[in-house]
Swiss-Prot record:
Part of the 30S ribosomal subunit. Forms a bridge to the 50S subunit in the 70S ribosome, contacting the 23S rRNA. One of the primary rRNA binding proteins, it binds directly to 16S rRNA where it helps nucleate assembly of the platform of the 30S subunit by binding and bridging several RNA helices of the 16S rRNA. The keyword Ribosomal protein applies. InterPro entries: Ribosomal_uS15, Ribosomal_uS15_bac-type, uS15_NS1_RNA-bd_sf. Gene3D superfamilies: 6.10.250.3130, S15/NS1, RNA-binding. This is Small ribosomal subunit protein uS15. One of its GO terms (molecular function) is rRNA binding. One of its GO terms (biological process) is translation. Belongs to the universal ribosomal protein uS15 family. GO terms for cellular component: cytosolic small ribosomal subunit.
Amino acid sequence: MALAIEAKRQILTGNQRHKTDTGSPEVQIALLSTRITMLTEHFKTHKKDHGSRKGLLTLVAKRRRLLTYLRDTDPERYKAVLLKLGIRR
């Protein structure tokens, strides 16, 4: 499931470090978290969609790697991202 352009733009503006930032870990984690939430809602009605479930696990693993990178490089930004996005870790 892809994000709509407006939804993606809204996520970007809320998590950018500067005006043209699209690749910082904070932005990537926020985008992945939104996609994970969308897929989780999808699975509430489509329990046997195993192909998409594999995609969900891939997204969760990618977000986990980005969070680990952010924790190791800048713990303050890491804590801020966890609080802002409500991620339990």
